[in-house]
Amino acid sequence: MATKIDKEACRTAYNLVRDDSSAVIWVTFKYDGSTIVPGEQGAEYQDFIQQCTDDVRLFAFVRFTTGDAMSKRSKFALITWIGENVSGLQRAKTGTDKTLVKEVVQNFAKEFVISDRKELEEDFIKNELKKAGGANYDAQTE
């Protein structure tokens, strides 16, 4: 059966993360049968990491505060998590299903496809977002 997405519910969750006045910094999009729906959400990145277990595949939209001493700003990441115990067929479908998620999640600085929990470390993701952000003025700090 072809995968579908609940666009309205997913868009609501996506906008919650994009809203700087919201405490929610991440949301997952998971499978409910053959439909992608919003999953968990939260204000702590470590809580998101707990969702990424070996037997699940999910998509996540995460807000990080990056920048240097001169300018702090929000950067967004689209993370595709595929656990080690996910079957080959489901792994393959995840790649094509991501196009549905991208119909909703359209603004992000960098995209990650991760199956190793070490790559979920906050410092690793922030460093990659910093590289994607262009100019770095950290050398000007005293």
Curated annotation (Swiss-Prot):
Annotated Gene Ontology cellular components are: cortical actin cytoskeleton; nucleus; site of polarized growth
Sorted UniProt keywords = Acetylation, Actin-binding, Chaperone, Cytoplasm, Cytoskeleton, Nucleus
Q: Which GO terms describe its molecular function?
A: actin filament binding
- N-acetylalanine found at: 2
Question: What is the protein name stated in its UniProt record?
Answer: Coactosin-like protein
Region named Flexible and important for F-actin binding = 66-75
Q: Where in the cell is it found?
A: Cytoplasm; Cytoplasm, Cytoskeleton; Nucleus
InterPro entries from the UniProt entry: ADF-H, ADF-H/Gelsolin-like_dom_sf
Read off the Pfam families from this record.
Answer: Cofilin_ADF
Q: Which PROSITE patterns match?
A: ADF_H
Q: What does this protein do?
A: Binds to F-actin in a calcium-independent manner. Has no direct effect on actin depolymerization. Acts as a chaperone for ALOX5 (5LO), influencing both its stability and activity in leukotrienes synthesis.
Give the source's domain of life in one word. Eukaryota
Subunit structure, as described in the record: Interacts with 5-lipoxygenase (ALOX5/5LO) in a calcium-independent manner. Binds to F-actin with a stoichiometry of 1:2.
Q: Which organism is it from?
A: Bos taurus (Bovine)
Positions of post-translational N6-acetyllysine modification: 102, 126
UniProt record similarity statement = Belongs to the actin-binding proteins ADF family. Coactosin subfamily.
Domain ADF-H span(s) in chain numbering: 2-130
Query: What's an example Gene Ontology biological process for this entry?
Result: regulation of actin filament polymerization
Q: Which CDD domains match?
A: ADF_coactosin_like
